Amino acid sequence: MITSPTYEGVISDIEGIAKVAHVHGIPLIVDSAHGAHLGFGGEFPQNAVRLGADAVIESLHKTLPSFTQTALLHLNSDLISKLRIEKYLGIYETSSPSYILMAGMEVCIRTVKEHGAELFDNYRHELNKFYKNCEDLKRLHVMTGKDLSKEEAFAWDDSKIVIFVRDSSKSGEWLYQELLLKYHLQLEMASGDYALAMTSIMDQEEGYQRLSAALHEIDRELCGAGTAKKQQAMNEKKVRYGNETDGSMENMYEQQVHRGSFIKEVYRPNPQQMQIYEAEEKETAEVSFDEAAGRVSADFIFLYPPGIPLIVPGEAITAEFIERLRTCISLKLNLQGSTDLFAERIKIVYF
């Protein structure tokens, strides 16, 4: 089972992976919750159903005009038993389905079927204009496909607008709040050094223009603050080393304000001390972060969205992991667990 596209729009080589899996008789299940709009035009990559995945889950409500909680499960081959799927749907599905939600799904599907060509053509036109307008940003950076190598992404879904902050004193959460409180623009999520805006076929030119204008205004403000910071750094160097400066001063400054990959750092794997089920069967205790270093986690801790665990029960709580938690807290990211993490409390296996 793989996720494609990811929250940020990274798409895997579904066709290639499916071929390898099928050689070994293994079905490929694709969590394509954020890819319901793929394959209908607009120059977007093809969807996983047409690329040979055996089961594909798509959330209509994430990228198409449909109510929250509406999704589709596509069964695409005989490698997955339809009877088995029906069995588990009977166990987990509600016995009181919402006819409003189901009717909304039908309207969504009919809209795409009857008006999809026009809607997706306009969608592509507006996205292209937006990305072109944002090419001149200096302290902010709107990600494009050129930022990703083939090793990082087979393809990319640019309906996800990923906006990076290049100023080390600002975070993705800061940008998220700035756009919300000052410009009344609601983004989807924030991470360490970027924020994510979701778009759909229903977005109009006005929305893209408002976001572009807001980003340019914020960018100008950051450039002004950055110039003052740069001058201060240069003055401090002159005081310390005299008036001679070398050509690397600009690069030194840029390195100071540009953080490395926050995601790679915060999701660094933790050493496993025991299986999850073993940790959950043992006694637990709630302790401070400082007391927890060197102990074993008894909790799932994750950033939401997207909800990928930073640590799970049975993994070692290292001093480095505690520092990563403190970094998330300092950036005001949505850190979740069963304890009050913002009060620096964490649940450990007690033995």
Regions found by a protein language model. Give the residues of each.
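Terminal helix/beta-alpha structural elements that buttress the NAD(P)+-binding lobe
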Residues: 338-351
